[in-house]
């Protein structure tokens, strides 16, 4: 095709594509498909030429003049096929209520943009506009092991609860995985805090599958979102989890590691946050607990600040407690319970609360034995206290004060 014919064809193609999504967005999506694993190269090309649309005009020879010989991805030279694929990708994402947000958008997260390996763009699935989700508010990433202990779960919930006492309300960022991630997401949702789940799959699928209901709850809650820089249809491959950790670390001004082995995914996220010059916090644990080895290692190496209580954690983050404190809120709810406003006599409730407070992890059978109350009565009280957010219950029906 001659140069004149190509230019005419290119203009017609561009005009046709501009109508639905905007040509620059389609070009950015195309670059993400071709260079998603090398975002720094895409960013350099855009900076050099001024726009993704200008990048898509180049042929192989022109690209090699900029990047050097033998450095051009074959996918990048098939412009027509790549642009058509990108347009289909945007339509597919839209079917799931997702938009493609790129670094040229005003709503693209400012802290993420600072990272040298920031994604070219990412898909955002939410009932809110990106401008609302990534508005000027604190973002705190909370990560850790999938095999979270009762101690880790309790402190994860406490620390998220403490975030609910500050204003403006921070956004809790995590990865939707088992254990620590989902604990942080659910506690945030229960307290009305915004939360973002960064996924290692396409925006059209949820991993793990048992978290689908949680993911849909996040996507349908105002101010919350599911995000991914992977195209639709991407499977949950191991390397995808490693790469998505950079987004979890990059979105936030601080990362909190709850529990992790020395080589856990949470450790990787914490190290990335440290490399981005962000604040890193870690929950110290027993020296003989494998799940705390990563946290203790970071603290010992001065890569992370030890979290010893909720108040100092908030102070270190520089967050102002502008709303009712979580501790005061919990005490007020307990007073309401003890006044007989919840499920029966205050004396029985006080007995249950005292036993749970003194015996962290006590199960229902032991509560029945020690309280002298009937099983049905104990079960009803515990359920009511859980609904009030005063105690937490795990899958084994073990109880703890929140």
Specify the residue positions occupied by each region the protein language model found.
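Cysteine-centered motifs
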Residues: 2-7
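Generic detector of N-terminal low-structure segments
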Residues: 8-12
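Short, small/acidic-rich helices and loops at N termini and domain boundaries
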Residues: 13, 17-107, 388, 393-397, ...
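Glycine-biased, small-residue-rich flexible motifs in mid-sequence functional cores and linkers
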Residues: 16-22, 102-402
